[in-house]
Structures are given as C-alpha cells and as structure tokens.
Amino acid sequence: MAATPYQTGFIAWKSSKGEFKEWELNGTRLAPDGQLVIDPSAAAFETDPMPFMEGGISFYNGGAFRVGEAISPVITSPFPLDELVPSWNADTPTGAWLEVGLRVRVGERWTGWYNLGVWAADTTTISRHSVSDQTDADASVSTDTLILQSNSDTQAFQMRLRLFSADGVQTPAVRMASVAFSSPRPITPELKPGNPRYWNKHILVQECSQMIYPDGGNVWCSPTSLAMVFGYWGWNAGREERVRTSVAGVYDHIYQGHGNWSFNAAYAGARGFDAYVLRVTSLAELEPWIAADVPVVVSFGWREGQLSGAAIPSSNGHLAVLVGFDSAGNPIINDPAAPSDDGVCRTYDRREWETLFLSRAGGTVYIIHKPGWLPAA
C-alpha cells in the first residue's frame, strides 16, 4: 500500500483586506484600518491568575488588566489534522500584550482552548512565554505547536486572540493572524521534482554565524537566521547588533530558548514585516519565493552522517536561510552553525536535505518580507 501523501494547509486573516470582520468579537473591535484592538467600553476587568510563577515571572502582568477576545470562523481542513502552528503580526506598545489559542473539533465535539503563547514585543509589562503542561486525551502543546493525539476525526479548528491592556488605554493592534496545519509528518517523504527555470540563482544575504558568540550562540540558530533576513531587507545595523537584538526579541521565558517558531515570526512582524510560519510539502514550493528575491528561513534536523557537508555533526532541530539553488537544483543555504561568518554559505545535496526538511520538521519555514511583496504566480 502506498504511503499517504504529506498534506499541508494555511489560512490567514489580514486587516488590510478587512478579514477580521469575519471574527466574533467580545471586548474587542476593529480600528478604522481594520486592525483588531481592544474595545475599552466592553473589555472585561480581570487580574493575573498566577502572579508568581517559577523563574520569577508572572503569567500575565502580575496585576490587573482589561481583556477582550476575538474568535475566528470555523476552518475546515480538507484532510485530517495532525499539527497546527499559529502566527500573528501585531503592535504591542508598553502596557499591552496578547494571548493566542487554538481548539479543534473532534467528531461533533469541540476540545477546550489550548494556549499557544502569551506575547509582547518587549518585556516591560510581561515576560513573553509559551505554556507548558497542556496534554489531555485530545491533544498536547509542544511550545509552538498543537499536536493531536489522533487525527482520524479532526478536520476543523478555530483560533482565538485575547487582547490585554494594563491601563485600558494602550492596546495591541493585530494586523495579521494565521495558522499553518498539516497531516502526519512523512517518515519517508515523497520528493517532488523542482522547476529548473528557478535554479541557478543566489540571493546575496550577508552571512552570520551563531557560533562566534560564546555566551549562548550555539543555540541561537533561529534569531541568527532572522538577523540575516533582516539585514537583507534593509536593517543596516552591524551583524552583532542584529543578532543580539533578535536573540532578546524572540526569547521564550518558559521554553527558555529562542526557537519558538511563532515567536520568531511575531518578532519579525513587530519589526514591520509580513511574517508567518508556513508548512510546505516540497522544496519545489519554495522555488518561487527565491525567484521573487525572498530568502526563506527553513527548519530541519539530522543525525550524524545524514547531511553531507553539515556545519555541525547533528541537530535535533535547526534553522537556517535558504538563499538560492545551484544549476542542478541543490539548495544554497546560509547555515548559521558554521564556525565563522565566512563559512556560513553552503550548498547541500537536494535529496539529502529535502528529506530531512520534510521528515524532521514537516516542511516548516518562516516567510518574511516587506509588506505586499509576493512571488509571481
């Protein structure tokens, strides 16, 4: 029997297209530009349920706040769901933050809401964090990903955004929300041929090594990849400033790391980019982005001996930047695990790398670009 093909889906709502009008609003409203904000006249008054958590942080702000919520329409997947990863782009001024939830319909029954993160762009008011210890008979949360226990009868979901204001005046302003969803990751993925007309192209993205920073750089692959992309799109700060600022901007105080996919996309969004987590079924799906001059942050993992020319012997989960394809279609990747900046750009064998990209990370990428910059059809 042939293996079931890997399937992925994506849904997004953008304020620029008026798409939050589809959401159910309770204590929130739409600003004139379509962004989702708190409605001070209708928001509830609440206090932090866990002001003293392990590690010296609070679940929210440690005190009182106003909160409203917005719930998406029911989204039906064309295939049984296995994993879901949310993204959002929002401004969160000091005194404002947001919380992201997902729930899934199992048969005719809805699960409870799973918490996929409490977010603000800085730590003046809250300590941004994922939420651990969320496992039940229906699903579990692994930092940034909702994982279903069984995908046999789960083909619908909803997203919830809760918006918070410490003073009832400052408000988050959400301009985009999205969910990437997928079927079970393929153990032995079916590799699809690419299109040679997209090959033999290399986007020049300044190389940045994570390994030159002795104070934690060995685990900074994701923010270092962001730093490379930010430099490409015009942030003219030096390499180290871009890296260290990104490291601070994506840190998850519960996960105690920098690899939260959703937080990385949210941080890029906070810097003014269109940014979201996407899952694809093949490397070929990324070729049009390279053709459109959009470098793509890619996730993959490998055991020792699985990736020829790898910058380090192995990794359970790693992020790097796809910057092009050589004349044979092999991916050209700025790999921050290189020991120095000048060794970051590498070309990996397409079959080897794509297999690891799909089987170990489910084809997960960050799409980050200037607003409105899209590949040609």
What function would you assign to each model-found segment?
Residues 10-59, 63, 76-79, 95, ...:
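Noncatalytic regulatory segments and standalone regulatory/sensor domains
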Residues 12, 162-258, 310, 327:
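Active-site-adjacent structural segments surrounding the nucleophilic cysteine of cysteine proteases
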Residues 62-63, 72, 240-376:
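Conserved active-site-adjacent core of cysteine acyl-enzyme catalytic domains
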Residues 64-87:
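Contiguous beta-strand segments within globular domains
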Residues 79-93, 161, 302:
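A short beta-strand element within beta-rich, extracytoplasmic domains
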Residues 96, 221, 318:
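Histidine-centered active-site/metal-ligand motif
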Residues 111-152:
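Extracellular carbohydrate recognition and processing domains
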